[in-house]
Design a protein with these regions (language model features):
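Small-residue-rich transmembrane alpha-helical segments that form helix-helix packing/gating elements
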Residues: 1-32, 37-172
Length: 174
């Protein structure tokens, strides 16, 4: 029974991250009608930026986190401006090929830049896990889960309670 509870907790934590990624893909497809194959590479780019800021440049983890997110958003905006804006109205096959090309280009650029060897950053969290009865969770994973839940909640509020969200919903239904 303890193993089952541990697996359920692990699945919930991983599911929170996947849900956040899925919401991003859904928003991009719903608004822009683009299947963003490079979405995962933007996520990886943010992770590499965290490595750069924390391990190479020595920036504080909590300062580096929003900077890495901002750089990822800026790269996504640049991709939209350079690759997709000119293709508005193009059929889905064309935009899919463009995004597959972007995915391959980003993946290979990151591999050339970072050598394809797994990187890790120093954690600001305790190394001993949080123990809740018979289950345990690392503080890193708990942090990721809480941030994912907060961002999912913020996305829900934006989509359902703001003018921007109303415009987004109208675009989805168009």
């Amino acid at each position: 029974m303890d193993q089952l509870l541990q697996h359920i907790l692990n699945a919930l934590i991983l599911g929170g991250t996947y849900a956040l990624l899925g919401i991003g893909l859904t928003l991009i497809f719903g608004i822009m009608r683009v299947v963003n194959f490079a979405h995962g590479e933007l996520y990886a780019f943010g992770a590499y930026m965290m490595y750069l800021w924390v391990m190479v440049l020595g920036t504080n983890f909590y300062l580096a986190l929003p900077l890495a997110v901002l750089l990822g958003v800026m790269l996504g905006a640049l991709m939209e401006f350079v690759l997709l804006r000119k293709m508005r109205g193009a059929d889905i096959d064309t935009t899919m090929l463009i995004m597959i090309g972007a995915w391959i280009a980003l993946q290979n650029t990151q591999q050339l830049t970072w050598t394809g060897v797994a990187k890790s950053i120093d954690s600001p969290f305790p190394t001993s896990p949080l123990v809740l009865g018979s289950v345990s969770v690392s503080w890193n994973r708990l942090f990721v889960f809480i941030v994912a839940l907060a961002l999912i909640g913020a996305t829900y509020v934006i989509i359902n309670r703001t003018r921007l969200g109303k415009a987004m919903r109208a675009t989805f239904q168009d």
